[in-house]
Amino acid sequence: MIKIERKETPHTQEAMDDLQEACNTGRSYNTEHVNQALQEVFHGKCYICENKEATSYQIEHLIPHRGDKKLKYDWNNLFWVCAHCNNIKSDKYEPILNCTTEPVEHLIAFRKTGYFGTDEKLEFVPVKDDNVAIRNTILLLNDAYYGTTPQKKMEARIIRRTLRKDLSKFKEYVREYQEAENEEEKEDIAMLLKRELKDSSAFTAFKRWLIWDNEEKYGELEKFIPENQKKKLFDI
């Protein structure tokens, strides 16, 4: 989970028009325009687990609406989520951090320790402050990545496997960058690192924290993180 800017997209106004009409008529908010706009805003990935390879995505209410029309049809309360995380979250974690207004990855550290087997572990740790929203978000992240039922645990293993492969690829780019023999080769790999550290990348929070946790070794690579998300801006 990282901060995602809720930017205007080609379908944003169409989505908001659909939501207004749906609110007036009592119809569903689940329209094609709303789905398209949310997919674009959230870069096609689940806002909770950051997986981009899920087979099913849904519209989720950050604040459960419980029949409240304003919350039900509020564009700013609608988020793009995979079916796995949506089913786990439901209305059980309240409040959680709003990733469109709060710098989640600067409030929570995202770490993967160990390797294959029992030593591998995902950790979500408050960076400085610790409040109810942060604690609830950490509970949600743990349940999303590890599952809460036998079926959800199986789904979570697939997400962790996807995360492992993605991080392994990222680490390989880092190694190639550090071992590059000339500037041309380094520039080519730099383009890959920039792509992997963008908001649109899968599992971005883990990749950024890999750099922040290893400043002596990887400090040079922070220049590839978008300017508005650099560590120094948040004093962590």
Give the positions of each predicted feature.
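DNA major-groove recognition helix of helix-turn-helix/homeodomain DNA-binding modules
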Residues: 85
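C-terminal, charged low-complexity interaction regions
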Residues: 139-236
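Histidine-centered nuclease catalytic patch
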Residues: 48-80, 89-108
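Residues that form or immediately flank small-molecule/cofactor binding pockets and catalytic motifs
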Residues: 9, 64, 113
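Bulky hydrophobic/aromatic packing residues
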Residues: 31, 75, 203-206
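Short, charged surface segments at domain edges that flank catalytic/cofactor-binding sites
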Residues: 1-45, 67-73, 168-175
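Domain-exit/linker segments immediately C-terminal to small folded modules
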Residues: 14-17, 89-183
